[in-house]
Curated annotation (Swiss-Prot):
Protein role: J region of the variable domain of T cell receptor (TR) alpha chain that participates in the antigen recognition. Alpha-beta T cell receptors are antigen specific receptors which are essential to the immune response and are present on the cell surface of T lymphocytes. Recognize peptide-major histocompatibility (MH) (pMH) complexes that are displayed by antigen presenting cells (APC), a prerequisite for efficient T cell adaptive immunity against pathogens.
GO cellular component, one term: plasma membrane
Domain of life: Eukaryota
Subunit structure: Alpha-beta TR is a heterodimer composed of an alpha and beta chain; disulfide-linked. The alpha-beta TR is associated with the transmembrane signaling CD3 coreceptor proteins to form the TR-CD3 (TcR or TCR). The assembly of alpha-beta TR heterodimers with CD3 occurs in the endoplasmic reticulum where a single alpha-beta TR heterodimer associates with one CD3D-CD3E heterodimer, one CD3G-CD3E heterodimer and one CD247 homodimer forming a stable octameric structure. CD3D-CD3E and CD3G-CD3E heterodimers preferentially associate with TR alpha and TR beta chains, respectively.
Compartment annotation: Cell membrane
Gene name, Swiss-Prot/TrEMBL: TRAJ42
Protein name: T cell receptor alpha joining 42
Sequence segments annotated as region (Disordered): 1-20
Keyword terms of this UniProt record: Adaptive immunity, Cell membrane, Immunity, Membrane, Receptor
GO biological process, one term: adaptive immune response
């Protein structure tokens, strides 16, 4: 999952820098 996408999908507000 991407950073900002992770925020929108999970709504955790955590930046997961998996995708560049």
């Amino acid at each position: 999952y991407g950073g900002s996408q992770g925020n929108l999908i999970f709504g955790k507000g955590t930046k997961l820098s998996v995708k560049p």
